[in-house]
């Protein structure tokens, strides 16, 4: 999330310059359509175990869509998205094992990802996959939709090893032009031409030719058609790379456009089987006055026209401004790219160790140019006949001095907090006869933005949620069917370019400014322009103020049925108003009169909730409330309420539409009741157990110091002798008597019998442990506590404890024990039972 200071600082700069930044900066889509609302419009395909719908190819004549995914190929009918065929093309287990042994990931990398899929001729497709980091290519029979038998071709230079790396390619007259990374490590970039009648051609492996590029797109432009100079067709490649010419930022990444000529044959001695027409220039997507620069090129779309002169390119860019992430769309004209490639070159100066403009005379024929009529008149019919000095110049000067600037000298659209990933464009003729360009932009969180280009600015028609938090991985448009196809990691989606039926009123249809839609006066519906007569349709794409347009045509106004609401006096009443557009504002009426935006102590409009709050409703607040969605001078009825106020206790209510899923509410109530019952039973059980424990404790207390020990009568034991331990420690008598004269005896500290054998059972002495094979545990007996202490009453008349007087023995015990000291680890408990 960008800090507030960054957003406000940038907004202040835009406002201060006052150059109309509101027409391209962070525009708000007029409508937001969730995936649930698209359920009746879109078609979806997914299959267990199939992932990464990366490559989409349309064949308009056959009406088929070919899809390349991870280790699978599919053929669909475009209109119904019905599966026509499927091919499983998995990398063998041994290839995957080798991939894992080389340190690659067995979950995301060691598979066969389809990266190239295009028609080779009328009967076959040419397909290439990463094949677990050992790229392979083969042919697909379009009639049977099966892989051709035989050995797979080596895909090196045609397809990347790594599925995450950029790739661009296209087939032109049976020849494959590809831009990829040519080795396992991804350190050797290459722009390659192979297959077809000519021998293969590739770029020089030099940093100032290609420096860590990430390829995003390619385009074929037939510039020889209708050329007065006899020019050649060209193939353009779009990528981003680390700039070698930057003085201050050695690690700066810039966007590039490069081009080669279709008829390039390489040089005879210099640049043998290397491009002699390879030139590149920087693509600028910036607004210098706003200090916005976009260099991270993500995707490029080529919009062809009936004439190649009108070819337009749309680039998708990303940038970071402070902690704020931005995305932008820039438009480029082919003639601007041609102008830059005909301009001055850059040159590296060894002395200054930097790149600068080449100022010396340019040799003739012009280095890097295609073979044209001028070359033929001067005896150069092929690049093989070009002089070495021309080829050496091209080899050292592939970079142009000037950069290709965007149309309108700034981006068409900039959005903050959004990552644009893909773009396709379409040209549409409106009812006014003008041609409009409609852009469809995919995002990193699964949304599709639809915008119409209106000269130097755009209007965001809507945003559609195609996927749930999944990046859009591919996007194509069928010009003939007017259908869009988008792929993500888990599914494929088909949807029409426009859903005109969702506009329910004339004003809503016209305010959408969608070139595909118009309001039909005869049917009172918003319909697609293509299938209706223009004389009965209303459409205004360029007009921003549509007030009165629908009224003049006599269109019917649709008013929603009011909801009856009864509230208690003193209640804060919330009346929601669902606006038809994100660009609209709510206007409320009460009793037919307009309500102010805020009336302290009575009415308050909450923009966050999009609701009118009636504070402490009183009988004077009863009546009819109507909410209108007001946009560009047009008023659309949105909600209506009939409120009645009755006397009673004060509670807070919110007006809501009738619950559609009442069964779910009752189910939740029953579940909550069951949980409460279980908790109640648990509390009662714990309470019963606690009562039992307390009763046991009370009974034990009543038995304290009441019953003497009944010990068996045995013969008198011999007199006690101390144990023959030299380190015996005497006990301190202090702490072994109670305040009432009672003696504490610790079991286990008795005197030892002479001889080494087990002692004979002693006679019954009050307080002495009972005889046992080892030692008697007194913890559970009466007159003893948990530590086994026995309390002896040595004073008074009952000192004998067994009914016969033992004064001599008692005195002897008291005298002996007073001479002993407590053991170091002893800590006898003072309590007794």
From Swiss-Prot:
The chain crosses the membrane at residues 664-684. GO terms for biological process: axon guidance; cell migration in hindbrain; cerebellum development; muscle cell differentiation; negative chemotaxis; neural crest cell migration; neural tube closure; positive regulation of cell migration. Residues 21-663 are extracellular. PROSITE patterns: IG_LIKE (PS50835), SEMA (PS51004). The modification Phosphoserine is found at residue 742. Residues 748-807, 814-833 are annotated as: Disordered. Keywords: Cell membrane, Cytoplasmic vesicle, Developmental protein, Differentiation, Disulfide bond, Glycoprotein, Immunoglobulin domain, Membrane, Neurogenesis, Phosphoprotein, Postsynaptic cell membrane, Signal, Synapse, Transmembrane, Transmembrane helix. Residues 30-497 form the Sema domain. It is found in: Postsynaptic density membrane; Cytoplasmic vesicle, Secretory vesicle, Synaptic vesicle membrane. Disulfide bonds join 99-110, 128-137, 261-370, 285-330, 500-517, 509-526. Belongs to the semaphorin family. This is Semaphorin-4C. It comes from Homo sapiens.
